[in-house]
């Protein structure tokens, strides 16, 4: 893989992680392709969810690989109660080994989300983020100074494009229970559909955000506090912001950046809006003051 796009203070750790992913992606694909990969275990993770077999197998594989990196001090999986910590290193990795696992049996797109933090697990310390999506093809997206998209072919990641969101998109991925949506959100969604937006929600956050990014605009929303800050929300918020979009939530009717949120507990959850500029403006218009 050509690493010419990666520059600055955190470039080396990102390159090391990508190198691990490039070497391990075939193994990860093998785990996902096993006939019983989507079968539920009898366990319960720290978030109260029941993981599938592929969740646990990928988690073990990724943890071992991330801990092998010399400059990584701590590794923290969504499946675990607390991080695994080493004596040395500067970086902390928080990851969701298999986002979208609940729809994997339907053969929908799933992926691994990775947040690279410096010194502490805080949004303000997020140095970079990455995700790999597994479908009929495998792709890697990296957020550092900008957002870079790669396709996996002949055992290597090949550069496809630098992703920059346009001002206005054409798709929306609106998750959650609609009966619980606020009146403002319902009006905003009605307005989007009146403008001929297309609904593209799959139940896999990484897949839906990937769709918004590669289509160069749109909106992903999950108004209920269900998504985990460290493992899903912050890494994908950074991805959207670096692509010139907005990542936000509403606090008593006031729009605020997701990446300025505090973290009171490791598995704390948040509402989440990820959008290009036009959609962000519309959402603020209707949800402001609610």
Curated annotation (Swiss-Prot):
Mg(2+) 2 binds at residues 96, 99, 232. One of its GO terms (biological process) is fructose 1,6-bisphosphate metabolic process. Keywords: Carbohydrate metabolism, Cytoplasm, Hydrolase, Magnesium, Metal-binding. Pathway: Carbohydrate biosynthesis; gluconeogenesis. It catalyses: beta-D-fructose 1,6-bisphosphate + H2O = beta-D-fructose 6-phosphate + phosphate. Belongs to the FBPase class 1 family. Its cofactor is Mg(2+). Its EC number is 3.1.3.11. GO terms for molecular function: fructose 1,6-bisphosphate 1-phosphatase activity; magnesium ion binding. It holds the Pfam family FBPase_C. Binds 2 magnesium ions per subunit. PANTHER family: FRUCTOSE-1,6-BISPHOSPHATASE-RELATED, SEDOHEPTULOSE-1,7-BISPHOSPHATASE, CHLOROPLASTIC. Signal peptide: none annotated. Substrate binds at residues 99-102, 201, 226. InterPro entries: FBPase_C_dom, FBPase_class-1, FBPase_N, SBPase. It is found in: Cytoplasm. This is Fructose-1,6-bisphosphatase class 1. GO terms for cellular component: cytosol.
């Amino acid at each position: 893989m050509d690493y010419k796009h990666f520059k600055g203070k955190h470039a080396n750790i990102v390159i090391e992680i990508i190198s691990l992913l490039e070497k391990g992606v075939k193994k990860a694909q093998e785990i996902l392709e096993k006939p019983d990969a989507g079968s539920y275990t009898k366990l319960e993770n720290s978030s109260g969810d029941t993981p599938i077999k592929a969740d646990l197998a990928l988690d073990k594989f990724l943890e071992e690989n991330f801990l092998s990196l010399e400059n990584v001090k701590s590794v923290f999986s969504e499946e675990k109660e607390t991080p695994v910590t080493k004596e040395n290193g500067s970086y902390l990795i928080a990851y969701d080994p298999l986002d979208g696992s609940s729809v994997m049996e339907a053969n929908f797109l799933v992926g691994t989300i990775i947040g690279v933090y410096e010194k502490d697990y805080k949004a303000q310390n997020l140095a970079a983020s990455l995700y790999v999506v597994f479908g009929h093809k495998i792709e890697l997206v990296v957020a550092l100074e900008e957002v870079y998209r790669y396709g996996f072919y002949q055992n290597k990641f090949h550069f496809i494009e630098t992703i920059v969101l346009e001002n206005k998109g054409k798709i929306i991925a609106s998750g959650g229970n609609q009966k619980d949506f606020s009146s403002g959100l319902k009006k905003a969604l009605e307005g989007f559909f009146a403008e001929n937006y297309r609904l593209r929600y799959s139940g896999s956050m990484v897949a839906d955000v990937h769709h918004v990014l590669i289509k160069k605009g749109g909106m992903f929303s999950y108004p209920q506090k269900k998504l985990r800050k460290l493992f899903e929300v912050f890494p994908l918020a950074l991805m959207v912001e670096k692509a010139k979009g907005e990542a936000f939530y509403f606090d008593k009717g006031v729009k605020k950046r997701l990446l300025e949120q505090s973290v009171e507990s490791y598995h704390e959850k948040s509402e989440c809006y990820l959008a290009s500029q036009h959609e962000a403006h519309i959402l603020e218009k209707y949800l402001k003051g609610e």
